[in-house]
Amino acid sequence: KHYGKFVDGSTQEIDVPYDIPDTWEWVRFSTLVEIVRGGSPRPIKDYLASEVDGINWIKIGDTEKGEKYINNVKEKIKKSGLNKTRFVKKGTFLLTNSMSFGRPYILNVDGAIHDGWLAISNYENSLNKDYLFYILSSNVVYSQFLSLISGAVVKNLNSDKVASILIPLPPLSEQQRIIEAIESALEKVDEYAESYNRLEQLDK
């Protein structure tokens, strides 16, 4: 039997995606993080700023699929729009909640987010940020997202749905070993890709 932890500290028997080591736990995401939705001042054109002291306006268009970080933004908004949006700090996780939903990014800038984003914060006590990125990028999480929106006409995630997912939680020391193993494997993939591209060029 497997038991999940809930925000109030209670436990309940749950169905889990797969068996995990004894030192790990299946945990409801809501017990580990804070999740909030962004907001959009409208009409947005009235709040866009040209001045250098404007607030970074972080949009999904500022991302690249497959990238891990958001480093730069194209637009800024006026400070008067802050009470109609959500300001988030560097290090916050962002998750797309509509269109190409379920894509995680880590912020490398402070700024304001619109309602196409969910912001995930206060994870540091239980989750290494790199482990959190890889688990949010995994099939075990994405399959739960798909299940949560199945049957919906508009395929959107909200904070309650994301809070309800189960994630496998290893001890922090083991999270670090998992990160190192993943990043070592990714380096080898990049090396093989470079070698393949060189061979392709030689054949031309």
Predicted segments with their positions:
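Specificity-determining recognition surfaces
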Residues: 118, 138-167
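Sequence-specific dsDNA recognition surfaces
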Residues: 9-15, 30-47, 61-90
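Short proline/glycine-enriched turn/loop segments at secondary-structure junctions
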Residues: 47-48, 108, 153-156
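Structural signal for hydrophobic
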Residues: 24, 58, 91, 164-165, ...
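A short beta-sheet element
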Residues: 59-61, 73-137, 158
